[in-house]
UniProtKB/Swiss-Prot annotation:
Entry keywords, A to Z: ATP-binding, Cytoplasm, DNA replication, DNA-binding, Lipid-binding, Nucleotide-binding
SUPFAM superfamilies per UniProt: P-loop containing nucleoside triphosphate hydrolases, TrpR-like
Subcellular location: Cytoplasm
Source taxonomy: Bacteria, Bacillati, Chloroflexota, Chloroflexia, Herpetosiphonales
CDD domains xrefs: AAA, Bac_DnaA_C
Comment on protein domains: Domain I is involved in oligomerization and binding regulators, domain II is flexibile and of varying length in different bacteria, domain III forms the AAA+ region, while domain IV binds dsDNA.
Complexes and interactors: Oligomerizes as a right-handed, spiral filament on DNA at oriC.
Family: Belongs to the DnaA family.
InterPro entries in alphabetical order: AAA+_ATPase, Chromosome_initiator_DnaA, Chromosome_initiator_DnaA-like, Chromosome_initiator_DnaA_CS, DnaA_C, DnaA_dom, DnaA_N_dom, DnaA_N_sf
Molecular-function annotations in GO: ATP binding; ATP hydrolysis activity; DNA replication origin binding; lipid binding
PROSITE patterns the record matches: DNAA
Protein name, per record: Chromosomal replication initiator protein DnaA
Region (Domain IV, binds dsDNA): 348-472
Length: 472
């Protein structure tokens, strides 16, 4: 057998030995690169998949490969861009099924024991599912390379609450689909079982509910409401940072739900380690489960999003117009869809077909970068400091610790790109560094942007925060 046949058969064996969401999320997109000298090399599409396989699936992989090959091998996982998903393997039925390979379909019945009826709770909307937007479903979410892992993780959580990744922490810039994914989890879970208790709120709503409960002397009712649910979905959790009372209450809410085997899903515009003034005990808990970044959509994904939006609006939009928008609007999904809406409205008001010329006219103010907000050096230092969780004084200083080098080089890049500061002036802002050092840092970021997707996402997110939603 060649490597493709070996891996095809191995995956079929693995389907009987691990949970389906684990298989779909972590193993389906891998490939067997080579088998030689008792060493099997497996290619993973990204760092996260590689780490999860090494942490959780090495023994079962060795065993499955040994069964297929007829001899035992060691396994090494590498990152490989050439890891196409094979044709769906047929699960191999073992002659003597082991009890450990059977996975019972989870039931939500256990979640509802001793939980009060929602309409008996005095705080907030009594119908918790009513806050979920029915349009936010997995089927309406456009999946691309920038969000594939986040989508798979959310699907796993929706299918098997508290059994896959708990908590699940999504982070990324504004308008990238985090809210869509959070609400898709709730809608999917409720479609499977209308009796499941799902609560989707923003961190601001959580804070306001707590304040109102304290004012009305209803803190016990507040705790009953938030601690007797099956799936808690909280958007923009970064806003509880610096609010001691809210963090204290959420800490105990988190512990109660997690200890009871309930699912918690959080979203933020930055990873836990970069949320300044977040209590360490909360930060560590947010890192217990899986942390996934939702990146800015690539060109292919932007094109697919625009096509889907055009079909939803039932408006004929040519491929030329879609390509024009996809190439020029690169910041986020929200702005992308908003620009298409604007172009269509402009065409309707002027009673003209949707053409590239019409799109260019409708978006003239957005595409004219000269009309963007003027960014200052202080703006850049502030946003980079918050994004990476590094104090501004450390970035400006002379220290050379590893955790400061990248943020400092990003500052050099943004100051060079977004302001009129000279290399000498940038060096003065960074502790009196020589202009050649600044040029080296700028060139380093420029070169890395061609191959480092995470760095590209960082720069785009920073520009979004510097300019608002109309970042380039």
């Amino acid at each position: 057998m060649d490597t493709k046949q070996i891996w095809f058969t191995t995956l079929g064996t693995l389907q009987n030995q691990i949970l389906r969401y684990d298989y779909d999320t972590w193993l389906k997109t891998t490939a067997l690169v080579s088998v030689a000298n008792d060493l099997a090399v497996i290619g993973a599409p990204n760092v996260t998949t590689k780490q999860v396989i090494e942490d959780r699936f090495m023994s079962v992989l060795r065993r499955a490969l040994g069964e297929v090959l007829g001899y035992q091998v060691n396994v090494r996982v590498i990152i490989s861009s050439a890891t196409p998903a094979p044709s769906e393997p047929v699960a191999v039925t073992p002659s003597e099924p082991s009890p450990t390979t059977e996975v019972a379909e989870p039931s939500f019945a256990s979640f509802n024991q001793a939980a009060p009826m929602l309409n008996q709770l005095p705080l907030g909307d009594p119908n918790r599912s009513s806050v979920l937007n029915p349009r936010y479903t997995f089927s309406s979410f456009i999946v691309g390379t920038s969000n594939r892992l986040a989508h798979a993780a959310c699907m796993a959580v929706a299918e098997h609450p508290a059994q896959a990744y708990n908590p699940l922490f999504l982070y990324g810039g504004v308008g990238l689909g985090k809210t869509h994914l959070l609400q898709a989890i709730g809608n999917y879970a409720l479609d499977r079982n209308p009796e499941v208790n799902v609560l989707y709120v923003s961190s601001e709503k959580f804070t306001n509910d707590l304040i109102n409960a304290i004012r009305r002397q209803q803190t016990e009712e507040f705790r009953i409401r938030y601690r007797n649910i099956d799936i808690l979905l909280i958007d923009d959790i970064q806003f509880i940072a610096g609010k001691e009372g809210t963090q204290e209450e959420f800490f105990h809410t988190f512990n109660t739900l997690h200890g009871a085997g309930k699912q918690i899903v959080l979203s933020s515009d930055r990873p836990p380690k970069a949320i300044l003034t977040l209590e360490e005990r909360l930060r560590s808990r947010f890192e217990w489960g899986l942390i996934v970044d939702v990146q800015n959509p690539d060109l292919e994904t932007r094109t697919a999003i625009l096509r889907a939006k055009g079909e939803t609006l039932q408006v004929p939009v040519s491929s030329e117009v879609i390509d024009f928008l996809a190439q020029r609007i690169q910041s986020n999904i929200r702005e992308l869809e908003g620009c298409l809406n604007r172009v269509i409205a402009y065409a309707n008001l002027n009673r003209t077909p949707v053409t590239v010329e019409v799109a260019s006219a409708a978006l003239a103010d957005l595409l004219d970068t000269s009309r963007r907000k003027r960014v200052t050096a202080d703006d850049i230092f502030r946003e980079v400091s918050q994004h990476y969780g590094i104090d501004q004084r450390a970035i400006r200083g002379r220290g050379r610790s590893r955790n400061v080098v990248l943020p400092r080089q990003v500052v050099m890049y943004l100051l060079r790109e977004e302001t009129d500061a000279s290399l000498v002036e940038i060096g003065e802002l960074l502790g009196g560094r020589d202009h050649t050092t600044v040029m080296h840092g700028y060139n380093k970021i420029t070169d890395d942007l061609t191959s480092d997707a995470r760095l590209r996402n960082d720069i785009t997110s920073l520009r979004q925060r510097l300019y608002g939603e109309n970042a380039r």
